[in-house]
Amino acid sequence: MSRRNLALVLAGLGAFLLTLIPLTRLYVSVHVLKAPLEQQSMTRSVAESATYLDPVTMRPAVGDLVQTRWLIGDVLAGNDDRAVWGESVSLSTRDDERLDYHERRLAFDRRTGAIVNCCGEYLDDDTAIRQSGQAFRWPFNAQRHDYTLFDLRLRRPVTAAFDGVEQVRGVETYRYVQRTPRRLVPGETAPLPRHLLGLPGTGDVGLARYAEIRRTYWVEPVSGQPVKTLDEVKETLVTADERGRLTALDAAFRSTEADVATALNTAAAYRRWILTLGTVAPVGGGLLGVGCVVAAVWLMRRRSPAAQDEKQVPGDQLADAR
């Protein structure tokens, strides 16, 4: 191959590699930074020495509680832009005596994690509800500002405020906190005998359920993956005149160490993909592309030895030589 042809090949290769830089970043943002359609996971959070209303005696009891959460993806209902997952949350004692249960189905944007109202959305027995905010995760490259979530217990959007940066097992995370003051919990609450609330007289009395919630999320920001949670909940049953009240739940649910480790591994996998395809590949390709272009220019500017000799030999000597 002649020097000129080699220079042209190098120039073309360099231009191609430089063109790949924005294309690689676009590929990462479109195809890599997406939540999966398929999902099947189960996590647990445990509240030690919690106070709860025993469903048998209908009196406050103290013991460990377990909150179990299942996530199942509906692959056929999703597409390139949205995923559809079902979520079930069950609250029970260590003896598997169920105290509470919620179930919902929703769609969300696979890149931002924002809820999309479609695809048979429901929460418990309410099919008309329209949920909003983040679903199951933060957006990729989460920012240090507040985000909106949808609270299953309160059935309404709430704010998770950015609360600082914290290391979780050596990994930098952003901490977000939902602080919800005393608020009425929607739905019917079964009446209880008056004497259980310390009220005089006989018969049952109607009640309303109120909740105070402080929920903390630790989110790995690059992947948007929540890696740990602390769910502090206090629920109180109150009569209409507020003369009678009873603690229904006072607990602090913490993620298990095994679930924290699994979530950190998931976040690390996303980070590796993003680093490789979003930074290493473009930078490496860019440096190689620049090198090819520089080499091509150098070859084009450098004359061949024969041409240099021809320039140095006088014209009459060239004629005699011929």
Where in the sequence are the language-model features?
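Membrane-proximal low-complexity regions enriched in glycine and acidic/polar residues
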Residues: 135-229
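Conduit-forming functional cores of very large proteins
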Residues: 292
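Membrane-proximal extracellular "stem/stalk" segments
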Residues: 198-279
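Cytoplasmic C-terminal tails of single-pass
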Residues: 304-322
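Short beta-strand element of the conserved SAM-dependent methyltransferase core
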Residues: 71, 176-178, 235-237
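Solvent-exposed coil/turn segments that connect beta secondary-structure elements
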Residues: 47-49, 179-183, 234
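Extracellular or lumenal secretory-pathway regions
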Residues: 2-144, 239, 246-247, 254-281, ...
